[in-house]
Design a protein with these regions (language model features):
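C-terminal binding/interaction regions
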Residues: 2-48, 58-59, 77, 113, ...
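Flexible, solvent-exposed loop/hinge segments and secondary-structure transition points
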Residues: 38, 53-55, 86-89
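Active-site- and interface-proximal helix/loop "cap" or "latch" segments in soluble metabolic
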Residues: 62-66, 75-139
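Gly/Pro-rich active-site capping loops and adjacent beta-alpha segments
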Residues: 72
């Protein structure tokens, strides 16, 4: 493609969403295959960005389907564990944007413990219909939600052993984990395991 065929990093004639918090990279088929519910989430900018006083962050992404990434941010009440406000940043296709926004709406008002029971199917239902070859995006959002849960407890001082006992602990044999090349919860678990092994070695 020639430089003169580009405008602001997107091909001329093809509308792309490009903001500080949302970066659309795929627009081959426009909105074909998306339900009205999913497109409404894409158009909803009220949940983009980082809320004030965030104390839990989760991230998941992969380059297996192009550069796909989602970051979720939450302000969690430390006493009640209720997620009072959440926001997101997304990089990828419209389905990824819709999945991220759906995750934020689904999280708000729930406790961290309730949110830890997230599944890709739950978020897919909340998101609405997307093209079949984009259905995996709900899995990235589910991983990012688990990352929010894990990050909250790590910031509260949870150890590797504490995290393993929780329902949102990493399951590296799960399909979600296999799909995600980058996962903030997995990274945190690795760091905690290293710290645990070092402590055990010193005490031996």
């Amino acid at each position: 493609m020639r430089p003169e065929d580009m405008l602001g990093g997107a091909p001329v004639g093809k509308p792309y969403i490009r903001t500080r918090d949302v970066f659309q990279t795929d627009n081959d088929n426009g909105v074909e295959g998306y339900s009205d519910e999913a497109l409404a989430l894409v158009a909803d900018t009220s949940k983009t960005g980082v809320p004030e006083n965030v104390n839990a962050v989760g991230m998941a992404g992969s380059a297996k389907h192009g550069t796909i990434a989602v970051q979720l941010f939450a302000r969690v009440n430390p006493e009640t564990h209720v997620i009072e406000q959440a926001g997101y940043r997304a990089h990828g296709c419209l389905a990824m944007i819709a999945s991220a926004c759906a995750a934020v709406y689904w999280m708000e008002g729930k406790t961290i413990e309730e949110v830890a029971a997230v599944s890709a199917d739950l978020l897919a239902q909340a998101r609405g219909v997307v093209p079949r070859d984009k259905s995996y995006t709900a899995r990235y959002s589910a991983c990012a939600v688990r990352g929010v849960c894990g990050d909250f407890f790590v910031r509260q001082g949870a150890t590797f052993e504490d995290m393993l006992a929780r329902p949102h602990a990493c399951d590296d044999a799960s399909l979600d984990c296999v799909l995600c090349e980058n996962c903030s919860l997995r990274n945190s678990m690795v760091d905690l395991e290293i710290a645990s092994r070092l402590r055990a070695a010193k005490e031996a």
